[in-house]
Regions:
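N-terminal helix-turn-helix DNA-binding module of bacterial transcription factors
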Residues: 1-58, 335, 340, 344-353
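An alpha-beta-alpha
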Residues: 169-210, 218, 317-331
Length: 353
């Protein structure tokens, strides 16, 4: 056979070569979980499955995501598409780009295509001011729906989100341990549920770790590099010495803005991102970030949708996934001076003249 050998597949799946052979030849005597491990190993190694082992497509699922220029959304889309294919479903990925189709428009198109279900990521359900009538209509007609990254208590469907409160607690514990007492939060518009939860979590964590001796300043812009830069200029002007950003892209913008003011990251200002998308370990310096568990969230979303398609309501309600703080090179001990870091840097330079 071309490509991976039986030994390669067996090693990847953690089974014997004989077991791999039985699966490839569709022989009995292999449990369903073991068979799936072998099939997954085939896919991972790029081996072309024999025709009789290819998943049979039983339907179409719609996946509505924000713009894919944010790597974390692209990673979610890829993971969900792969998981759905293993369940026998093709995926119609609908991207909401500025000036393009709206979420409601996509949902109408998907319904006309008679999709088996819809997964919406960071959609209207994350916006506390948005009209939820389209979601209620989907529930009323019985079309399976899963909402990811955002929460609306009025929608009786499975909802899965990053645990923003846990994220802020981890970030605060790390920064307070480094001596930081005035923290800035750079996030998007306050009408979004994840933004509100991050701010609430940050303030609660500061009270818990510093017993009222800390200070929090929030800047609401947009979830982009430029938004992060604008927020950082605002926060640095108010004397923060550490910035927690609502996304990795915002963190990159914050670092750029700090450097434009002659500040060093992390010597003058510490910066933490959110999501820990793939390239953040290669930035200069490597970005400290709160890693979103893309695989787990995507798996939960697909499992919830499959359960809904089967009529199982056990997955209904909200479930939170705890992120992981990955400490790299953009956080360091706070400077002893309590001055505004930009003013402190200018004062130090003046003393050297």
């Amino acid at each position: 056979m071309s490509g991976p050998t039986l030994a390669d597949i067996a090693y990847q799946a953690g089974v014997s070569q004989a077991t791999v052979s039985r699966v490839l030849n569709d022989k009995p005597g292999v449990s369903s979980p073991t068979r799936q491990c072998v099939l997954t190993a085939l896919d991972v190694l790029g081996y072309q499955r024999p025709t009789h082992l290819k998943p049979v497509t039983t339907g179409l699922v719609g996946l509505i995501v924000p713009e894919l220029t944010n790597p974390v959304f692209a990673n979610h889309a890829q993971a969900i598409e792969t998981l759905l294919s293993r369940e026998g479903y093709a995926t119609a990925v609908c991207t909401q780009a500025p000036g393009g189709m709206r979420e409601d428009d996509y949902i109408r198109v998907l319904r006309s295509r008679q999709v088996a279900g819809i997964i919406v990521m960071s959609g209207s359900h994350a916006d506390t001011t948005a009209d939820m009538s389209t979601y209620h209509e989907l529930v009323d007609v019985g079309l399976p729906l899963v909402l990811v990254n955002g929460y609306s208590p009025s929608i009786a469907v499975p909802q899965i989100s990053d645990d923003d409160v846990s994220a802020m607690d981890q970030a605060v514990a790390h920064l307070v341990g480094l001596g930081h007492k005035h923290l800035g939060l750079a996030v998007g518009p306050r009408r979004y549920v994840p933004v509100q939860r991050k701010e609430q979590g940050l303030r609660a964590a500061m009270d818990r770790h510093l017993e009222g001796r800390g200070r929090v300043t929030v800047s609401n812009t947009v979830f982009s590099v430029d938004g992060g830069a604008r927020a950082a200029v605002d926060l640095l002007g108010q004397g923060v010495n550490a910035i927690i950003c609502g996304s990795d892209l915002m963190a990159l913008g914050a670092i750029r803005a700090a450097r434009a003011q002659g500040l060093s990251v992390p010597d003058d200002v510490s910066v933490i991102g959110c999501d820990d998308s793939d390239l953040m370990r290669y930035t200069d310096p490597p970005l400290t970030s709160l890693r979103q568990d893309v695989e787990l969230i995507s798996t939960m979303a697909v499992q919830s949708l499959m359960g809904s398609i089967r009529g199982d309501t056990a997955f209904f309600g909200e479930r939170l996934v705890r992120p992981e703080l990955v400490i790299r090179g953009t956080t360091a001990s706070a400077r002893v001076s309590t001055m505004n870091p930009s003013v402190s840097r200018q004062h130090s330079a003046a003393l050297c003249l």
